[in-house]
C-alpha cells in the first residue's frame, strides 16, 4: 500500500531532528538579516526553463492544468536570477533565503531527494568585496549552526571548463570524463587520455592529486599546463587565498572540484567536515547567470548551506 509509504528519497523528520533543523534555519536566517541581507522567498514550483534549457532527469517535473511543464526547484540561486531579470529590484543588493530544494537521485544510491537550505546571494557589488563578504557570512552561518570542525575547499570553474571546451570529443565521452574526475578515478583518467589525447593529458591525469595545501597544489598545477586561461585562474586563486589566510582557519584546494551548479563562472568553494562526506556549504561566482533571463551580466556570488548535512554532523552532541 502506497498510502503509508513515502516516495524515493523523501523522509519524515520527527521530534529532535525537526526541532533542531528548524532552530538552525531560524538562527541562520536571523543572523543574515542582522548582517544586512534582504530576506526573499521564492515559489517551490517554477517553469522548468528557470532551472535548465532542457528537461533534466535529476529534476522533479509535473504539468499544470494548462499543460505547462513545471519543476520543483532544485536550487534557489536560479530563482534569484529570474527575480533580478523580471522585476525592478535595483542592484547592488544582498539577498538571504531558506527553504526546500528537490533533486532526484537514483534509489540505489540511498540519498535524500529533499533538502533544507539557507543561503545568500550578493549581486552587483565589487568582486573582491563580494567574495570576502560571502565567505565571512558563510563562516558566521556555520558558527550559528553549531558546527565547529570544518574546512573551506576552493577551486576555480575556469579550470575544468577550459579543459572540456577544448576537447573535441562526443558528449558521452565528456560525461564519462566528468564521472572519472568526480570519483578521482586514476585508472579511468589514464585510459581516457590514451583514447582522447590532447594538450591537457598531463593535467587530466594528475587531477586526483591536485588536492590539499594551496601552495603545493598551485605549484604542481602550473607545471602541468601552459594554457593561459587556466594559469590566470590559478593566479586568481592564489591572490584570493593570500587575502583570506587570516580570516579563514583551514583552507585547502581541490582543482578537480566539479561545479555543484552549471552556472558557476569563477571562484568555487565548498565546506567539508570529517564525519560525513557531503558538503555543508557550496558556493561560487555566477556572473553570467542573468544573461539566461535576458538581463545584463552582473557580478554575483552566493552560497547555500545544507541544513540536513549540518544536522547529521552535530546531532550526537545535542541533548533532547
From Swiss-Prot:
InterPro entries given in the database record: aa-tRNA-synth_II/BPL/LPL (IPR045864), HisRS-like_core (IPR041715), HisRS/HisZ (IPR004516), HisZ (IPR004517)
One annotated GO biological process: L-histidine biosynthetic process
Keywords: Amino-acid biosynthesis, Cytoplasm, Histidine biosynthesis
Subcellular compartments: Cytoplasm
Key word Protein transport present: no
Keyword Amino-acid biosynthesis assigned: yes
UniProt pathway annotation: Amino-acid biosynthesis; L-histidine biosynthesis; L-histidine from 5-phospho-alpha-D-ribose 1-diphosphate: step 1/9
GO cellular component: a single term: cytoplasm
GO MF, one example: catalytic activity, acting on a protein
Family, as annotated: Belongs to the class-II aminoacyl-tRNA synthetase family. HisZ subfamily.
Note: This function is generally fulfilled by the C-terminal part of HisG, which is missing in some bacteria such as this one.
Biological function: Required for the first step of histidine biosynthesis. May allow the feedback regulation of ATP phosphoribosyltransferase activity by histidine.
Record text on subunit structure and interactions: Heteromultimer composed of HisG and HisZ subunits.
The protein's name: ATP phosphoribosyltransferase regulatory subunit
Gene: hisZ
